[in-house]
Curated annotation (Swiss-Prot):
Transmembrane segments: 709-731, 737-774, 794-816, 826-847, 893-910, 926-946, 980-1002, 1028-1049, 1083-1128, 1155-1191
PROSITE patterns recorded: ANION_EXCHANGER_1, ANION_EXCHANGER_2
Cytoplasmic face of the membrane: 1-708, 911-925
Biased composition (Basic residues): 76-97, 104-113, 280-289, 305-316
Function according to Swiss-Prot or TrEMBL: Sodium-independent anion exchanger which mediates the electroneutral exchange of chloride for bicarbonate ions across the cell membrane. May be involved in the regulation of intracellular pH, and the modulation of cardiac action potential.
Species of origin: Homo sapiens (Human)
Name of the protein in question: Anion exchange protein 3
Length: 1232
């Protein structure tokens, strides 16, 4: 009473008041009229009425009061980032050093006691702890310690402490009577000598807007006792900012402080207190829990320190992306909800409206106008970067508040916009997963949402938002036609929110992916579009929002009226496509402000293509778009690489660029090249052993997987079919000296040894077409010279070992780099022609022996042949044990033709079925890969069902025996069996040994080079020198036992590697498959070779196979080998007009006549090799094949330019692992 202050009813502690000086300086003339109004307000009679008639107190509405300690707590916590106002005043004395810690605590305690006493005259309007003489260093220490000086305020008529709340918003005073709202007790000013008139105004204080307007014109007026420091009076809507001359102008502080501070300080205070800085401004004024200890208690300080330690560093590292576009739609009951309409992992997938299913992935096509509107939207919309929120209601609340402050929406639309953002989300897979029992996602009403997800500020965790009921009031209806919209349940996270997730889609999303949610839609209550771009501080899992449980990092919200020209769907697709772009996605992670996002959009526009608005009749009209797009992407990558190099050259690496260096960087260490020469004898062999053999234990462990079992069964049939086919043909060529049994034994023995000792155990050793051609040529040479064929092979094998040792010692494997596709195509084309020719030649011989005659021999002649030891549809006896095969049999030629063509077409179309659209990918692969065994089985059954027609069968001995026991044994004497082997031939055998070495070297090393491609991602390495040494040395062993020489079979080896390849499941729909790993081990090779060896016991079954069926397989191998050779494609272009030529580099970068010239050179080499092969000098055809290597590197550069040779003779083909891709025959340039 002595100080002129009347305590409020209930004993509430009043705010400290400042005495008014009795003598005031004269007022300026422009404010005298306002002084009269102020005098009426502060009249003595008015205070007498207030004293005599105190206002009635309603116990049901507890009041809220703030003491000076509350404001001190606000200034000394981390929410108040600016310096105290008293620091702006001139210091009364010189700054002093900080006292010891104990002295500081004593002084704080003393100052705490002073805060409850009214200030003396002359003190600043707002008291600061420590005064102006306290160093700023002490304030930093107090902020780090997280100490709080707030004391509980006793509410009137209550025995329990009432929590002080600071609510945020500008619409508070317009919604009185809300539950839970506390009335603020305003202090009464001191009575001055000029307040002698009766009051003319109401006792209630004016509204904050009126007070702000009045104070705006009183800057020059000295301090008035009517100044108040209530937070409600300092708040303002966003529309009041930036309008100095309007009625809504706000001032950052009271008149007295404004008089003592400069304009720069006032602008800084206005920016801090009145403006909004998204991502920086703290929206919460939160007091610590009442259960914490006092300011000096270590137990009360520990939780604050723990919270500070838990704060994580900002993660600016770009992650993989998953984008989901949700549009605001009405369901069947006309209730609004968010409906997923599109998604992006790398390409766009849209939901088809009619069928509610996902369409095919495609490259998103955007309109140029939508991109410009998006850029303008981000430039003028809200951008909240590094937002520290972990719940959808918290994010939505801050987004709505930011929209209000930025004048995008009105304050009265707060509730409607918030309810719209919290509507439930639905996805196309929801109904599919429910089946006959559609699920009903759990949702709650508005009150339960607020109660469960928004605890009070005193006890809530960090980042919690104030109670939205304080700001929303009665929620407005979302849609005009639905007056009961406030009763509709909102969609909030539930326990089983992801029951309808698609597991298949989840497998295609990378593990470290972070999602982007795009929300767009039309609402009737907004007058203009409102948008917000949000980047969370860390990715959080917002349940039931996305189709799959992926943590969300980015959100984009775009709401607006329907009467605008903005296409919200196209704008949502634009931002979603931008977020799926790699460079823009990285820029969004690294952006520090709005301008970085705008710059990233400009970069995206620089790499985009605008197609004129014209009708496109066919795909040929868009052929140039892909090439132009590739050129733009190349320039874009060059710009990014230049930026990275400039950043690295500057001595530092920008945050977020480390990933780019890791992925595409030039900082990678050079790999260990297995073909690099060491300069020492057997240096390459030693490196192969040291590189590969340390992985031997893992080669055994890695085989313990079911995929290896499936690969064994598959490759077994893939290896057995060529062994039977080539074995039967080899028996025909060598007159039974080597046949099926010898080839099966050789494949089994050499396969087991190579798998156990080889450097690349994934290679499959086997017989091949070039070796068959060489065996035929060497057999004819021995017959012409009257030499023993098998004895000559012994000496050829011994010389082969010598040459292989010399080649490996000199590290000659590097020569494989000089074998270009020019030579490989000639080699493969020649072998394919030989296969096709031999097939029809064998068929011609069948028609010659069994011609189509009008009259055939009588039945007795056929019966006589049967009595001689032949069955009508059985196997002929060995040629040496019975009479020659019968001739002139009816229908034999026609049935052989049917069996051959049937086998070929079944195997060929099953291979084509592999790339068709029928069935699933895995089923098609299995059927296509087993095409040869299936065709053989079908034709054998057809032949077996026809009992009255004779067909020549495969000659297979019983048990483990040679094909012709009367001609040879398992061991071949080196000096001759029937007669002595001539010594000159022992020396001359070095020539055919050199020729067979050429074939083995080319096939083995080229196959190893294909398997070791970087695209196949083999981690354990390979060994060219060790593999060549093993195959060559085992060739010498084969000569001693009369077994065929083997080499690395290209097609079978590549098929083996593909069968053991594990593909990544986290691949975006529409993207090309990527290899996760290859199960490199030795066990599958050992098992495959062992099973092929055990097939010798199936002699009874093998003897049922007609030779015509093997001719069909031979034709199949020749035709399929031609399909993957570029030479055959260029050969067809000779007969095709230029306008129908495909878009290939060898067509677009080379003139047509020069391309045909290159093709004719290759055809000339093939014709020369064919002529040599058809003469007595056929043994020399490997040497002529080797001469094509110097022809390519010495002669062709004189005829063609380097760019032309690069287009015509470049090895740019990569393995295709797509289920619908090409098969191994189309990828390889090597013969079968």
């Amino acid at each position: 009473m002595a100080n002129g202050v009347i305590p409020p009813p209930g004993g509430a502690s009043p705010l400290p008041q400042v005495r008014v000086p009795l003598e005031e300086p004269p007022l300026s003339p422009d404010v005298e009229e306002e002084d009269d109004d102020l005098g009426k307000t502060l009249a003595v009679s008015r205070f007498g009425d207030l004293i005599s008639k105190p206002p009635a107190w309603d116990p049901e509405k507890p009041s809220r009061s703030y003491s000076e300690r509350d404001f001190e707590f606000h200034r000394h916590t981390s929410h108040h980032t600016h310096h105290p106002l008293s620091a702006r005043l001139p210091p009364p004395h010189k700054l002093r050093r900080l006292p010891p810690t104990s002295a500081r605590h004593t002084r704080r305690k003393r100052k705490k006691e002073k805060t409850s006493a009214p200030p003396s005259e002359g003190t600043p309007p707002i008291q600061e702890e420590g005064g102006a003489g306290v160093d700023e260093e002490e304030e930093e220490e107090e902020e780090e310690e997280g100490e709080s000086e707030a004391e509980p305020v006793e509410p009137p008529h209550s025995g329990t402490p009432q929590k002080a709340k600071f609510s945020i918003g500008s619409d508070e005073d317009d919604s009185p009577g809300l539950p839970g709202r506390a009335a603020v007790t305003k202090p009464l000013p001191s009575v001055g000598p000029h307040t002698d008139k009766s009051p003319q105004h109401s006792s209630s204080s004016p509204s904050p807007r009126a007070r702000a307007s009045r104070l705006a014109g009183e800057k020059s007026r000295p301090w008035s006792p009517s100044a108040s420091y209530d937070l409600r009076e300092r708040l303002c809507p966003g529309s009041a900012l930036g309008n100095p001359g309007g009625p809504e102008q706000q001032v950052p502080t009271d008149e007295a402080e404004a008089q003592m501070l400069g304009s720069a300080d006032l602008d800084d205070m206005k920016s801090h207190r009145l403006e909004d800085n998204p991502g920086v401004r703290r929206h919460l004024v939160k007091k610590p829990s009442r259960t914490q200890g006092g300011r000096g208690s270590p137990s009360g300080l520990a939780p604050i320190l723990r919270r500070k330690k838990k704060k994580k560093k900002l993660d600016r590292r770009p992650h993989e992306v998953f984008v989901e576009l949700n549009e605001l739609m009405l369901d069947r009951s006309q209730e609004p909800h968010w409906r997923e309409t599109a998604r992006w992992i790398k390409f766009e997938e849209d939901v088809e409206e009619e069928t509610e299913r996902w369409g095919k992935p495609h490259v998103a096509s955007l309109s140029f106008r939508s991109l410009l509107e998006l850029r303008r939207t981000i430039a003028h919309g809200a951008a909240l970067l590094d937002l520290e929120q972990t719940t959808l209601p918290g994010i939505a609340h801050l987004v709505v508040e930011t929209m209000i402050v930025s004048d995008q929406i009105r304050p009265e639309d707060r509730a409607s916009v918030l309810r719209t953002l919290l509507l439930k989300h639905s996805h196309p897979n929801d109904d599919k997963d429910s089946g006959f029992f559609p699920r009903n996602p759990s949702s709650s009403s508005m009150n339960s949402v607020l109660g469960n997800h928004h605890p009070t500020p005193s006890h809530g965790p960090d980042g919690a938002v104030p109670t939205m009921a304080d700001d929303l009031g009665e929620p407005a209806p979302l849609w005009p036609h639905d007056p009961d919209a406030k009763e509709k349940p909102l969609h909030m996270p539930g326990g089983d929110g992801h029951r309808g997730k698609s597991l298949k889609l989840l497998e295609k999303i990378p593990e470290d992916a972070e999602a982007t949610v795009v929300l767009v839609g039309c609402v009737p209550f907004l007058e203009q579009p409102a948008a917000a771009f949000v980047r969370l501080n860390e990715a959080v899992l917002l349940e039931s929002v996305l189709e799959v449980p992926v943590p969300v990092r980015f959100l984009f919200v775009m709401l607006g009226p329907s009467h605008t020209s903005t296409d919200y769907h196209e704008l949502g697709r634009s931002i979603a496509t931008l977020m799926s772009d790699k460079l823009f996605h990285e820029a969004a992670y690294q952006a520090d402000d709005r301008q970085d996002l705008l710059s990233a959009i400009s970069e995206f526009l620089d790499g985009s293509i605008v197609i004129p608005p014209s009708e496109v009749e066919g795909r040929d009209l868009l052929r140039s778009v892909a090439a132009f797009q590739r050129e733009l992407l190349r320039k874009r990558r060059e710009r990014e690489q230049t930026k990275v190099e400039m950043t690295t050259r500057g001595g530092y690496t920008a945050p977020g660029k480390e990933l780019s260096l890791e992925l595409g960087g030039s900082e990678a260490t050079p790999e260990d090249d297995p073909l690099l020469r060491t300069g020492s004898v057997f240096g390459g062999l030693v490196r192969d052993v040291r590189r590969r053999y340390p992985h031997y234990p893992s080669d055994l462990r890695d085989a313990l997987h079911s995929q290896c079992v499936a690969a064994v069964l598959f490759i077994y049939f893939a290896a057995l079919s060529p062994a039977i086919t080539f074995g039967g043909l080899l028996g025909e060529k060598t007159e039974g000296l080597m046949g099926v049994s010898e080839l099966i034994v050789s494949t089994a023995v050499l396969g087991v040894l190579f798998s156990l000792l080889g450097a690349q155990p994934l290679l499959v050793v086997g017989f091949s077409g070039p070796l068959l051609v060489f065996e035929e040529a060497f057999f004819k040479f021995c017959r012409a010279q009257d030499l023993e064929y098998l004895t000559g092979r012994v000496w050829v094998g011994l010389w082969l070992v010598v040459f292989v040792l010399a080649l490996v010692a000199a590290e000659g494997s590097f020569l494989v780099r000089y074998i270009s596709p020019f030579t490989q195509e000639i080699f493969a084309f020649l072998i394919s022609l030989i296969f096709i020719y031999e097939t029809f030649y064998k068929l011609y011989k069948v028609f010659t022996e069994h011609p189509l005659l009008p009259f055939y021999p009588p039945e007795g002649a056929l019966e006589g042949s049967l009595d001689a030891g032949l069955e009508p549809n059985g196997s002929a006896l060995p040629p040496t044990e019975g009479p020659p095969s019968p001739r002139n049999q009816p229908n034999t030629a026609l049935l052989s033709l049917i069996l051959m063509l049937g086998t070929f077409f079944i195997a060929f179309f099953l291979r084509k079925f592999r790339n068709s659209r029928f069935l699933g990918g895995k089923a098609r692969r299995i059927i296509g890969d087993f095409g040869i065994p299936i065709s053989i089985l079908v034709m054998v059954l057809v032949d077996y069902s026809i009992t009255d027609t004779y067909t020549q069968k495969l000659t297979v001995p019983t048990g483990l025996s040679v094909t012709s026991p009367d001609k040879r044994s398992w061991f071949i004497p080196p000096l001759g069996s029937a007669r002595p082997f001539p010594p000159w031939m022992m020396v001359a055998a070095a020539v055919p040994a050199l020729l067979v070495l050429i074939l083995i070297f080319m096939e083995t090393q080229i196959t190893a080079l294909i398997v070791s491609q970087k695209a196949r991602r083999l981690l354990k390495g390979s060994g060219f020198h060790l593999d060549l040494l093993l195959i060559g040395s085992l060739g010498g062993l084969c000569g001693l036992f009369g077994l065929p020489w083997l080499t690395a079979a290209t097609v079978r080896s590549v098929t083996h590697v593909n069968a053991l390849t594990v593909m990544r499941t986290a691949i975006a729909p529409g993207d090309k498959p990527q290899i996760q790993e290859v199960r490199e081990q030795r066990v599958t090779g050992v098992l495959i070779a062992s099973l092929v060896g055990l097939s010798i016991v199936m002699g009874a079954v093998l003897r049922r196979i007609p030779l015509a069926v093997l001719f069909g397989i031979f034709l199949y191998m020749g035709v399929t080998s031609l399909s993957g050779i570029q030479l055959s494609q260029r050969l067809l272009l000779i007969l095709m007009p230029a306008k129908h030529h495909p878009e290939q580099p060898y067509v677009t970068k080379v003139k047509t006549w020069r391309m045909h010239l290159f093709t004719c050179i290759q055809l000339g080499c093939i014709a020369l090799l064919w002529v040599v092969k058809s003469t007595a000098a056929s043994l020399a055809f490997p040497f002529l094949l080797l001469l094509t290597v110097p022809l390519r590197h010495c002669l062709l550069p004189r005829l063609f330019q380097d760019r032309e040779l690069q287009a015509l003779d470049s090895e740019d083909a990569e393995p295709n692992f797509d289920e619908d891709g090409q098969d191994e025959y189309n990828e390889l340039h090597m013969p079968v």
